[in-house]
Amino acid sequence: MRILLANKFYYSRGGDCIYTMNLEKLLKAKGHEVAVYAMQYPENEQSEWSCYWPANMTGLRAVVRPFGVRQVVRGFSRLIDDFRPDVVHLNNIHSQLSPVIAEIAHSKGVRVVWTLHDSKLVCPCYTCSRKIGGKLTWCTECFTDKTAVIRHRCLHGSLPGSVIGYLEARKWNRERLERCTDVFLPPSQFMKDTCVAGGYTAEKFSVLCNFIDVAKIPPFEDMPKGDYCVYLGRVNEVKGVPTLCKAAARLGKRLIVIGGGEMLPQLKQEYAGCADIEFLGQMNWDDFMPIVRKARFMVLPAEWSENNPLTVIESQSLGTPVLGARIGGIPELIEEGVTGMTFTSGDVDDLAAKISAMWNYSFDYRAIAMNAVEQYSSEAYYDKLMRYYRGED
């Protein structure tokens, strides 16, 4: 098949980018012809298709791009005509590319498949959350009142930005997006339920969990686990890292924090005198994989509704159980007492109690690894995805 993948960026910026680039490799390995559509950006990897991509979104472009500007329409239409895809597979496209590319593909008779990495279809600020009384809280006001984004200034506290978010949501409404999309693929039941609660038609959605490249997972080896737990991800408030550090410091249990983020300097300073907490900063897979592999467990203390976090899948594939916050799509990935445990998101007391419970719990690490590799392998994912590409959903 000829498959066109679309995503805002084309480098390892976040989960959506990593997914798109891994999918490109998988499809090419299976013998498909693959083209890519993204936005020009200094950190992008090289691509033979970049001549079709729109310019980086700065200045005035940031205001008009979300509504489908001429440069996007021209470039994407030309790519469709030149490449002649059988399927266009969309990922994160709002704002920088805009859903106009879905309409273009649909108008040219191309099947449109859309993987949903966030809640943008029903929430202008992507997360269905906002701060109330200083605490990040689940919010669905926009499901029934699109002006809520303006009233609460949900986009970075900016009135102009929130107005743009409102206008974007009005233009790319449910009816319009359902009309030009053949199937939406949320990676979690949670994301499907969120979109349906926001007014979308359930029959347009099919849950397809993310995958891992099992080639990068070393064969399981029985080895003693280290005397530490690990956090892997962005170091910020919504990821729950401050709450995790409080719990670890209280217990005197060793915690290794891997990742960069806006709160890293602050937390390093705050816990400089705590020998039990170690901050390693940003690391690549080859460097952090052995650390996660030997950890007693990985902690995902999210305080916002994560969709289908890859860190859970990767950790379990390495034979490392996961202690995850009971929020968003995280509980779907954890079998209580078998592949990990869950705790009440944002509750430092419950988190501390579950860290203690996990520390002394006997897990079958081999079974965790074997089951995860089988369940989340690229082969299993590919077989399911091809059915959606062929319209057999």
Model-assigned labels for residue ranges:
Residues I18, V230-R250, E262-P265:
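A conserved mid-protein helix/loop that constitutes part of the nucleotide-sugar donor-binding site
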Residues S107, K120, K131-F184, D193:
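Membrane-proximal helix-turn-helix segments that form the acceptor-binding/catalytic region
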Residues F190, F211:
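Carbohydrate-associated surface elements
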Residues Q266-P290:
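Nucleotide-activated donor-binding/catalytic signature segment of Leloir-type glycosyltransferases, i.e.
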Residues V312, I327-G337, M341-T342:
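Short acidic/histidine- and often glycine-rich active-site loop of Leloir-type glycosyltransferases
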Residues P321-G324:
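Short hydrophobic beta-strand element within catalytic cores of glycosyltransferases
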Residues E336-G337, M341-V348, I355-S362:
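Conserved acidic donor-binding segment of nucleotide-sugar-dependent glycosyltransferases
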Residues N360-R390:
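A charged, aromatic-enriched C-terminal amphipathic alpha-helix characteristic of glycosyltransferases
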